């Protein structure tokens, strides 16, 4: 179903560590093949239950730069409860705050499912 989605949301199970020191430690990141798949796709956005696309030690933000130089795409980080969404298609939207002179914002993420 991923090829039919507008947003690709990745449940890695990392949100279970929210509120612990482990959450912002050595979290999982996409490898080059996954990044190439996303860049080649026609997605409007991607989302994850981790703190970022890049490893915490990558101060150059290599994956962020690769993604945004090749795509006009939304990147959503720190999602929670993606395990409740299942593996099929569903409707998803996110609502950011309107902030000036910022490159990011907290959001309200909402998923809903057809009967």
Give a label for each model feature.
Residues 1-115:
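Active-/binding-site microenvironments in catalytic and ligand-binding cores
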């Amino acid at each position: 179903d991923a090829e039919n989605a507008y947003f690709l949301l990745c449940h890695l199970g990392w949100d279970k560590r929210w509120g612990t020191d482990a959450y912002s430690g050595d979290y999982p990141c996409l490898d080059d093949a996954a990044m190439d798949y996303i860049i080649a796709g026609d997605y409007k956005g991607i989302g994850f239950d981790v703190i970022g696309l890049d490893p915490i030690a990558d101060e150059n933000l290599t994956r962020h730069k690769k993604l945004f130089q090749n795509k006009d795409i939304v990147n959503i980080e720190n999602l929670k409860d993606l395990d409740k969404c299942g593996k099929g298609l569903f409707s998803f939207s996110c609502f950011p705050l309107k902030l000036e002179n910022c490159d990011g914002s907290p959001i309200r993420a909402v998923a809903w499912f057809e009967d």
